[in-house]
Amino acid sequence: MKEVRLHLRTALCEVLWESGVRMQCFVHATEPAGWFRFENLSDTLVPLLEMPRYHAGFGGRDGEDVPGSSLQRLGYPPAELIHTCRSVTATQEGWGGLVYRVHVAWEEPEQGTLEGAWSIDASLPGDPREPDAAAVVAPALGRGFQADLETHHRWWQESWDRSSISLPDKIPERQYWCRPGW
């Protein structure tokens, strides 16, 4: 990895690798979806969805940095994963009958570029509907990465235009407003 930048003003993360591959990602300001875009890919990239391990019985490190903090202690069943050639859906049962679903779908709009959207939806027992994150992702893909990025940026621009700060000491206030990227 060569560089990672989080643009606070636009809530966009960019990652640049030594190979020239560039990734942009954001969680939309007003839509319940997130986006990722990889550019300058020299080979096919297939996104991988790795769910939290809420259960025992798998190989490898469990990620427990603090004794007793492992998610395995929750004992939830493994997530059900459904893969297609351009999407993956995970359904996870949790405490009290909670069910959440993560859906990720992607496309290759041009050679060397991969764009994808994702969403998470949940339901509790008695909810009239099943969680359907795919119902959020499909229209997002229909709108496209660039269109959603523009509405996302517009929302953040309007938010910053309505924002202000006033500090009793004018020197830190000036430093706040003169920060790069603001």
Where on the chain are the PLM-derived regions?
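Acidic/polar, glycine-enriched structural segments that form the non-catalytic walls/loops
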Residues: M1-W182
